[in-house]
Amino acid sequence: MKGKYLLGILVILGALGYMVFGGLGRNLVYFLTPSEYLQDQARYQNRPVRLGGLVKPGTVQYDKDRLELRFVLTDGVAEVPVFHKGTPPGMFKEGQGVVVEGRFQEGVFQGTNLLVKHSETYQPPKEGWTPEEVRKLIEEAQ
C-alpha cells in the first residue's frame, strides 16, 4: 500500500517538475545589449529577447499614419536597428534609455513592446500648481 502512495507522489512531483522546468525553458526571455547580440547573432535569431540601450540621436523615424517607429539602439559600442509597430510611449525620445521586447529578424530587431526608462523620483504636484508648472517638473525629471 505504501508503495502505491510513494509511486503516486513521485509521478505527481515528476509531472510538476516537468511543467515548471520544461515550460521555463520555452518561455525564457533573454536580456541583451546590442554588443551582446552582435557577438552571437545566430543564437538569438527568431527568439524572444529584450534588447536594452539608448536611442541613438538622429535616428528616430516615426510614421504617424502607419504607426511605424524606426530607430537605432546603442550601448555606446554597438548599434542595432529597431522597428516597432505602434505608438511610442509619451516619454520616448532620442538619447533615452529603452528596453524593447521582440525578435531579431534579418538583422532588424522587430519590437513588440517598448519600455522607456524614466526617473525613479516622484514628486506630486503641489496644490495650486498650473499645468505649465507640472509640465516643467516632468521635463526636469527626465
Swiss-Prot record:
It is a single-pass type II membrane protein. Heme binds at H118, Y122. The keyword Nucleus does not apply. Residues 1-2 are cytoplasmic. It is found in: Cell inner membrane. Residues 24-142 are periplasmic. The chain crosses the membrane at residues 3-23. InterPro entries: CcmE (IPR004329), CcmE-like_sf (IPR036127), NA-bd_OB-fold (IPR012340). Keywords: Cell inner membrane, Cell membrane, Cytochrome c-type biogenesis, Heme, Iron, Membrane, Metal-binding, Signal-anchor, Transmembrane, Transmembrane helix. GO terms for biological process: cytochrome complex assembly. One of its GO terms (molecular function) is heme binding. One of its GO terms (cellular component) is plasma membrane. Belongs to the CcmE/CycJ family. Heme chaperone required for the biogenesis of c-type cytochromes. Transiently binds heme delivered by CcmC and transfers the heme to apo-cytochromes in a process facilitated by CcmF and CcmH. This is Cytochrome c-type biogenesis protein CcmE.
